[in-house]
Amino acid sequence: MSFCSFFGGEIFQNHFEPGIYVCAKCGYELFSSRSKYAHSSPWPAFTETIHADSVAKRPEHNRPGAIKVSCGRCGNGLGHEFLNDGPKRGQSRFUIFSSSLKFIPKAEETSASQGQ
């Protein structure tokens, strides 16, 4: 929590419905609800991305263990990845701003993938 500024309005912090989280700016798939977990920080936390290129990463030179992440498609700022700070040993914690995400419920995700 010390690496991010908290402005409130984190609507996805305690949101655990099945579905996917996409970039609010371009709609690119970022995180699955299966990788989301409860964390004490005020931001939604995820252990992994949907695709290897879902996020672009840039080191935080003044913050060891913190990496700035942005959308892998459009560059929209998403938050941070904290190395080895996930729920299991060796996992990362992606600390993501709710305002940078749009949620697509599982039912809509299935319909969209079937071309409906």
Curated annotation (Swiss-Prot):
Disulfide bonds: none annotated. Zn(2+) binds at residues 23, 26, 71, 74. Transmembrane segments: none annotated. Residues 1-106 form the MsrB domain. InterPro entries: Met_Sox_Rdtase_MsrB_dom (IPR002579), MsrB_Met_sulfoxide_reductase (IPR052150), Mss4-like_sf (IPR011057). Its EC number is 1.8.4.12, 1.8.4.14. The active site is at 95 (nucleophile). It comes from the Eukaryota. Keywords: Cytoplasm, Cytoskeleton, Immunity, Innate immunity, Metal-binding, Nucleus, Oxidoreductase, Selenocysteine, Ubl conjugation, Zinc. The keyword Zinc applies. It catalyses: L-methionyl-[protein] + [thioredoxin]-disulfide + H2O = L-methionyl-(R)-S-oxide-[protein] + [thioredoxin]-dithiol; [thioredoxin]-disulfide + L-methionine + H2O = L-methionine (R)-S-oxide + [thioredoxin]-dithiol. Pfam families: SelR (PF01641). Truncated MSRB1/SEPX1 proteins produced by failed UGA/Sec decoding are ubiquitinated by the CRL2(FEM1C) E3 ubiquitin-protein ligase complex. Gene3D superfamilies: Peptide methionine sulfoxide reductase (2.170.150.20). One of its GO terms (cellular component) is cytoplasm. Methionine-sulfoxide reductase that specifically reduces methionine (R)-sulfoxide back to methionine. While in many cases, methionine oxidation is the result of random oxidation following oxidative stress, methionine oxidation is also a post-translational modification that takes place on specific residue. Acts as a regulator of actin assembly by reducing methionine (R)-sulfoxide mediated by MICALs (MICAL1, MICAL2 or MICAL3) on actin, thereby promoting filament repolymerization. Plays a role in innate immunity by reducing oxidized actin, leading to actin repolymerization in macrophages. Belongs to the MsrB Met sulfoxide reductase family. This is Methionine-R-sulfoxide reductase B1. The lineage of its organism: Eukaryota, Metazoa, Chordata, Craniata, Vertebrata.
